[in-house]
């Protein structure tokens, strides 16, 4: 996996986790508020938010460079299952 892709994926996960914390702690009232502050569309924020709940094994694979080379931020975020096992299966992470 290219270093730029790895960095983009990890940055997206970190942002998504931060946004969820903001909502949970009441620092932001909505995804629309976050989108305005981030100068992004609310749709993009809502697309990325599920990355906050990404399987720890997938995050570790991104960090150590063993994640599939065709993994992208948008591809990973799109229709992300809630189950960690299903997430891992979807991207082809071997057990």
Go through each PLM region and give its residues.
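Short, Lys/Arg-enriched anionic-surface-contact patches
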Residues: 1-23
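C-terminal interaction appendages of subunits in large macromolecular complexes
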Residues: 4, 38-40, 48-52
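Conserved phosphate/pyrophosphate-binding and hydrolysis machinery centered on Walker-type P-loop NTPases
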Residues: 9, 38, 66
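Helix-turn-helix/winged-helix DNA-binding modules
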Residues: 11, 26-27, 37
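Short, solvent-exposed alpha-helical "recognition" segments
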Residues: 25, 48-62
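Short alpha-helical "recognition helix" segments of helix-turn-helix
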Residues: 30-38, 45
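Intrinsically disordered, low-complexity basic tails/linkers immediately adjacent to helix-turn-helix/homeobox/MYB/SANT
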Residues: 61-95
């Amino acid at each position: 996996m290219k270093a730029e892709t790895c960095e983009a994926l990890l940055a997206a996960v970190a942002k998504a986790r931060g946004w969820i914390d903001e909502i949970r702690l009441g620092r932001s009232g909505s995804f629309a508020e976050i989108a305005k502050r981030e100068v992004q569309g609310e749709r993009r924020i809502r697309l990325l938010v599920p990355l906050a709940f990404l399987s720890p094994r997938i995050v570790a694979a991104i960090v150590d460079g063993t994640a599939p080379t065709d993994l992208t931020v948008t591809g990973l975020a799109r229709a992300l299952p809630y189950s960690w096992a299903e997430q891992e299966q979807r991207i082809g992470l071997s057990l």
